[in-house]
From Swiss-Prot:
Disulfide bonds: none
Organism name: Homo sapiens (Human)
Protein name, entry field: Glia maturation factor gamma
Family note: Belongs to the actin-binding proteins ADF family. GMF subfamily.
Keyword Acetylation appears in the UniProt entry: yes
C-alpha cells in the first residue's frame, strides 16, 4: 500500500552510497544529506559530511526546505557501551511550499526502506536538531 504513495524513486548512485555508508568503519559522526530533484523525480545526494556534530549538522540544513538525512552517530549509552546507530531524520520545516512538502513526505517511506533504517525521526524546525534531542530519541532503543 505504501508503494502507491511513492512520489520519487531513489537515485541508484545514492542507493549504493547509502549501502556503503551503512558499513563504514570510521568511529566519528557522519551524515548524508539528500534532497528531491524535482525535474528527475528522484531523491539524490546533496552533501556528505564526516566528523559532524548534531549542532553542526543543523547549520547545513536549509531552514525553509525539506531534507532527508542519514546520520551515523556515536552514541554512548548510560552503562558506558558505545554504539553507532544509523538515524534517518526527515527535516520538514514549517513554512515549506505544500507541493514540496508532499513530494518529500510521499518519498520518505521508499527512502527509509531502501536504506533499511529503523530509527526514523522528524523535525519541524532545524533548531530541534541537537545532541540532547537525538540522545532522547535514541534512549527509546536499547
Amino acid at each position: 500500500m505504501s508503494d502507491s504513495l511513492v512520489v520519487c524513486e531513489v537515485d541508484p548512485e545514492l542507493t549504493e552510497k547509502l549501502r556503503k555508508f551503512r558499513f563504514r568503519k570510521e568511529t566519528d559522526n557522519a551524515a548524508i544529506i539528500m534532497k528531491v530533484d524535482k525535474d528527475r523525480q528522484m531523491v539524490v545526494l546533496e552533501e556528505e559530511f564526516q566528523n559532524i556534530s548534531p549542532e553542526e549538522l543543523k547549520m547545513e540544513l536549509p531552514e525553509r526546505q525539506p531534507r532527508f538525512v542519514v546520520y551515523s552517530y556515536k552514541y554512548v549509552h548510560d552503562d558506558g557501551r558505545v554504539s553507532y546507530p544509523l538515524c534517518f531524520i526527515f527535516s520538514s520545516p514549517v513554512g515549506c511550499k505544500p507541493e514540496q512538502q508532499m513530494m518529500y513526505a510521499g518519498s520518505k517511506n521508499r527512502l527509509v526502506q531502501t536504506a533499511e533504517l529503523t530509527k526514523v525521526f522528524e523535525i519541524r524546525t532545524t533548531d530541534d536538531l541537537t545532541e540532547a534531542w537525538l540522545q532522547e530519541k535514541l534512549s527509546f532503543f536499547r
